[in-house]
Each structure stands twice: as structure tokens, then as C-alpha cells.
Amino acid sequence: YLDHGLGAPAPYPDPLEPRREVCELNPDCDELADHIGFQEAYRRFYGIA
């Protein structure tokens, strides 16, 4: 058990996070992502994810 008083470690950076944010800002992409998943929705709107 290691507790250095720093809280939880930072999660590993998600390489898809910038694309996920782009999709979330587009209401149509965001809605589609709710149904088929972010990566497929992004691919349909913007090309290869």
C-alpha cells in the first residue's frame, strides 16, 4: 500500500480523447455515438478514427 498524499494517480492519457471531444461537440456525432459507440460515430462523420 503506497500513499504519498498525492491522491489517485493520473489515468493513462487516452490517445482518442481529442477525437472524442470533437465528436461530443457535434450534436449529431454525439447522438450517434450513444447508439453505436464513439469510434464508429467518429469514423462516419470524420473518416478513420
Curated annotation (Swiss-Prot):
Q: Where is the Gla domain?
A: 1-47
Q: Where does Ca(2+) 1 bind?
A: E17
* Main localization (coarse): secreted
Subcellular compartments? Secreted
Q: How is it modified after translation?
A: Gamma-carboxyglutamate residues are formed by vitamin K dependent carboxylation by GGCX. These residues are essential for the binding of calcium. Decarboxylation promotes the hormone activity.
Gene Ontology process terms (BP) = biomineral tissue development; bone development; brain development; cellular response to insulin stimulus; cognition; glucose homeostasis; learning or memory; negative regulation of bone development
Q: Sorted alphabetically, which keywords does the UniProt record give?
A: Biomineralization, Calcium, Disulfide bond, Gamma-carboxyglutamic acid, Hormone, Hydroxylation, Metal-binding, Secreted
Which cellular component appears as one GO term in the record? extracellular region
- Binding of Ca(2+) 2, residues: E21, E24
Residues that the record marks as modified (4-carboxyglutamate) are E17, E21, E24
Give the matching InterPro entries. GLA-like_dom_SF, GLA_domain, Osteocalcin, Osteocalcin/MGP
Report the residues modified as Hydroxyproline.
P9
Where Ca(2+) 3 is bound, by residue? E24, D30
Transmembrane region(s): none
GO molecular-function term, one example from the UniProt record? calcium ion binding
Kindly list the cysteine pairs connected by disulfide bridges.
C23-C29
Protein purpose:
The carboxylated form is one of the main organic components of the bone matrix, which constitutes 1-2% of the total bone protein. It acts as a negative regulator of bone formation and is required to limit bone formation without impairing bone resorption or mineralization. The carboxylated form binds strongly to apatite and calcium. The uncarboxylated form acts as a hormone secreted by osteoblasts, which regulates different cellular processes, such as energy metabolism, male fertility and brain development. Regulates of energy metabolism by acting as a hormone favoring pancreatic beta-cell proliferation, insulin secretion and sensitivity and energy expenditure.
The similarity comment for this entry is:
Belongs to the osteocalcin/matrix Gla protein family.
Among PANTHER family, the record links this protein to: OSTEOCALCIN
**What is this protein's record name?**
Osteocalcin
The gene from which this protein is expressed is BGLAP
